[in-house]
């Protein structure tokens, strides 16, 4: 039996109840897999079966995009113009193409207007049969349309041969040279931004896949928070480093409330914590020991906590040597206690390693269930003591604030 958690239809704990009870012991435990539905919508949960309780908004989406809005910054447009290169590169393609097309058309038109003004001042627009000996500044430019076409042909180096500049007007020659220099610089800038945007390692980072959920299980006798990461391309990533930041509200001893307090969460692979070889989908572990910022998690309070775990993978692209970063985040509703990931890597009949990504998002109950189903009274007592200690700290902070006033 496979239970699928569909966003908005039922809560995750209800879906997990479809798995057989663990009280029968590890020997009779049936290894059932759960497929985690992908969704970027804010998660909600039932509060004592009455209504829905919304959780704190994400700082970072599952795809790694920041949800923080920058507002009320003095001179923000000037700051963007001062860093024009980054501003143009960060533009979306539709805005970039529109801006560059408008830039070319405007330069053609503006220089065409100046050419038309030169021809008007020189009297080239009033030529007739009686003025056949008059030499114009620009041949065949007797209207604004002709001036625009001359500007376009000169800037794009088309050179049809009908319209050409003469030696009669030195200022027209100077304007032609200025146009070619200015537009060449514009073309260099445009070409550079296009190449820089295409070659950005951002697209390479999108081929790094994180598991949609995280699990808490025992690894080598230690309680660990586990996530999966996979490289979707054959080209390798070198010098990989995975780290995490725990974001949660924190109240200092002075009573100051920090909305997004950051705590470092260290991950490791097997016995190594630096530069894992990410050639196959790998499992990263964070040990929930006394030094862990997640040490207070229990099966009872996991879904009641309000925090966000941001995971960052920094790596160097083998083919371009560019540094890329892939990000994701996990909230309590996406962390499952007492589960483990279904193995993804297997050995084929031909002796080759095969990564089956249809199993990448699936989890199953851990066979070692003693760490979360035994001694529940002790866990409840520890949780009660922890809540009393938290209330005592909040009371001391409140008294300290009143004394300062």
Curated annotation (Swiss-Prot):
* Cytoplasmic face residues: 1-90, 196-405
Membrane topology field: Multi-pass membrane protein
An example GO CC term for this entry is:
monoatomic ion channel complex
Instruction: Kindly state the positions of the motif Selectivity filter in this protein.
Output: 157-162
Mind telling me which SUPFAM superfamilies this protein's record contains?
Answer: E set domains (SSF81296), Voltage-gated potassium channels (SSF81324)
Arranged from A to Z, the UniProt key words for this protein are: Cell membrane, Ion channel, Ion transport, Membrane, Potassium, Potassium transport, Transmembrane, Transmembrane helix, Transport, Voltage-gated channel
Site (Role in the control of polyamine-mediated channel gating and in the blocking by intracellular magnesium) found at 187
Which reactions are catalysed by this chain?
A: K(+)(in) = K(+)(out)
The membrane-spanning stretches of this chain are 91-117, 170-195
Query: Which residue intervals are annotated as intramembrane in the UniProt record?
Result: 144-160
| Positions in the Extracellular compartment | 118-143, 161-169
Cellular localization per UniProt: Membrane; Cell membrane
**Keyword Transmembrane helix belongs to the record:** yes
Can you tell me which family this protein belongs to?
Answer: Belongs to the inward rectifier-type potassium channel (TC 1.A.2.1) family. KCNJ15 subfamily.
Subunit structure of this chain's protein: Can form heteromultimeric channels with Kir5.1/KCNJ16. Interacts with PATJ.
Functionally, this protein is described as follows: Inward rectifier potassium channels are characterized by a greater tendency to allow potassium to flow into the cell rather than out of it. Their voltage dependence is regulated by the concentration of extracellular potassium; as external potassium is raised, the voltage range of the channel opening shifts to more positive voltages. The inward rectification is mainly due to the blockage of outward current by internal magnesium.
Q: What is this protein called?
A: ATP-sensitive inward rectifier potassium channel 15
Organism (species): Rattus norvegicus (Rat)
Q: Point out the gene that encodes the protein.
A: Kcnj15
């Amino acid at each position: 039996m496979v239970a699928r958690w569909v966003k908005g239809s039922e809560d995750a704990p209800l879906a997990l109840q479809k798995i057989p009870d663990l009280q029968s012991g590890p020997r009779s435990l049936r290894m059932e897999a759960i497929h985690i539905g992908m969704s970027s919508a804010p998660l909600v949960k039932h509060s004592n079966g009455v209504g829905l309780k919304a959780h704190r908004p994400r700082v970072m989406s599952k795809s790694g995009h920041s949800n923080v809005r920058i507002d009320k910054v003095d001179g923000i447009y000037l700051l963007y113009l001062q860093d024009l290169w980054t501003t143009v590169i960060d533009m979306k393609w539709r805005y970039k193409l529109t801006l560059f097309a408008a830039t070319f058309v405007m330069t053609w038109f503006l220089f065409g207007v100046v050419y038309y003004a030169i021809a008007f001042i020189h009297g080239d627009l009033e030529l007739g049969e009686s003025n056949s000996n008059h030499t114009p500044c620009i041949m065949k430019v007797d209207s604004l349309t002709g001036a625009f076409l001359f500007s376009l042909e000169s800037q794009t180096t088309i050179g049809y041969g009908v319209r050409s500049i003469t030696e009669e007007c030195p200022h027209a020659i100077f304007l032609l040279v200025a146009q070619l220099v200015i537009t060449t610089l514009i073309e260099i800038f445009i070409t550079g931004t296009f190449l820089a945007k295409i070659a950005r390692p951002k697209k390479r980072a999108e081929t790094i896949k994180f598991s949609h959920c995280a699990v808490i299980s025992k690894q080598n006798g230690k309680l660990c928070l586990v996530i999966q990461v996979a490289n979707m391309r054959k080209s390798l990533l070198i010098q990989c480093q995975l780290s995490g930041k725990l974001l949660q509200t924190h109240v200092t001893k002075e009573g100051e409330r920090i909305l997004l307090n950051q705590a470092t969460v260290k991950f490791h692979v097997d016995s190594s914590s630096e530069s894992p070889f990410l050639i196959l989908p790998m499992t990263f572990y964070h040990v929930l020991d006394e030094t862990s910022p997640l040490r207070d998690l229990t099966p009872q309070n996991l879904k009641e906590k309000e925090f966000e775990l941001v995971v960052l993978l920094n790596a160097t692209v083998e083919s371009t040597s560019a540094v890329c970063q892939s990000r994701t985040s996990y909230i309590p509703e996406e962390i499952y206690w007492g589960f483990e990931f279904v193995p993804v890597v297997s050995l084929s009949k031909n002796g080759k390693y095969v990564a089956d990504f249809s199993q990448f998002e699936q989890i199953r109950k851990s066979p070692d269930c003693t760490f979360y189903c035994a001694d529940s009274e002790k866990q409840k007592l520890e949780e009660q003591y922890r809540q009393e200690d938290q209330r005592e700290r909040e009371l001391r902070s409140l008294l300290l604030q009143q004394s300062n006033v």
